């Protein structure tokens, strides 16, 4: 994972703006501690902070085309770069082994109509020096963060994190996933669309468990592309256990050679974190023993988590309650992972959105409502779990990859008949996924009830957060929350507490507007609150809020 910043539409004062670009880039250097690079042209400046995963020796950025006319900064990984290189032979002379250089080759051949060719996670800025035009784009789901802004002199700016724009841009906002901005068009254009985004196109589809199994296995396998040591996040939940089991299956060989050469680091390391005797830790041990990873169990105390909150909010750039709760242990874990020399990990984010794994999905009234809620969850994932999966790890220079959000896998999983995903009454959630991988995991793991990460690390973590924030914020402060925070007024004392810290770091209106603030039960969207009358008077993102479903409900 890396960090990018760029300033476009420069007409004068380029030297002063170069200094600004360096300052912007320095704010996100934690994302790419291995090297810094900058390009200054007539109308654009692009800066890059590198975390080297593929081609550490020659893959530095900004990348430049052989004729020197195209300049590119990318934060991401292009998983199908080898196939694309083969396809582009003869059309482009590659200068490096970087997976991202295929973007330059594709642009040179096809202009801006190439983004659909990419399978990966990415945010990039490309400058065409000859035409004096630029192209900015973001991956389909928004796994990689990106923000776009403007100043009062008409400069357009982008940054991997909002802290790179805070104080420099007069207005900024998240760059929408699945979109691109081309300077000739002067607008955001959606490039990522799928037939499965319409319920009518999936409602009569068949369900093939083997196809689902094979598609996820292929996604994990291609995401093992790495020239540095990697590991897996193993919470002991279904999703991370599946990705870990598949990764272990292929870890002994280099996937870059189609399994012909031995892996440089053939022993797979797995990582779990929690309070002592947390549900996740116990489950993770069982999985690690069963699949044969070198397992690392990290304990943290509630006080250590509380002490980290201010830094966590600075890095993940949100005041959303469930994201802060879950990001704190992951932030602590990332530090340990990096201290062991590991720079990339696979995780299980996205499965609950794709398969309706959150416990409130038990209340879905019909297949159409179920499917449309998964679409809403996927479309907003960049504002929630993607922040945790990316920014809490990148705070320590660790890259997170998410096979459940792989573009090719999504086309298989989201075209499944929604009826096969539903979990009415006491039917266990994600049943079809469990069936697909039941032979790969211990039975008690394959059929373990969904536990949100912030719950699974230990119930005492959330319970203490609620208690301390309730005691720290007075009733009077809460009553006047809308006066202090007119944009997205906090809905409870815990959110008020996090919002106060967020405002200290990022005081602008743009920062406040970049974070969603909606009522939620067990991570539901606002629309799903209509599924159960009991939801109407609740606002608790923990899965334990779902009575008659969660085994340890409040």
Spans of features found by a protein language model:
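Adenosyl-5′-phosphate
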Residues: 1, 339-346, 365, 370-554
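Cysteine-centered catalytic environments shared across enzyme families
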Residues: 1-319
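Hydrophobic (often cysteine-bearing) scaffold residues that line and stabilize catalytic clefts
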Residues: 17, 80, 96-99, 118, ...
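Short, hydrophobic alpha-helix immediately C-terminal to the catalytic nucleophile
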Residues: 104-105, 241-248, 331-335, 356, ...
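Short, basic, helix/turn surface patches
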Residues: 125, 321-333, 375-378, 473-479
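ATP-dependent adenylate-handling ligase core
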Residues: 209, 273-334, 360-369, 391-392, ...
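Short acidic/histidine-rich active-site segments
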Residues: 342-352, 358
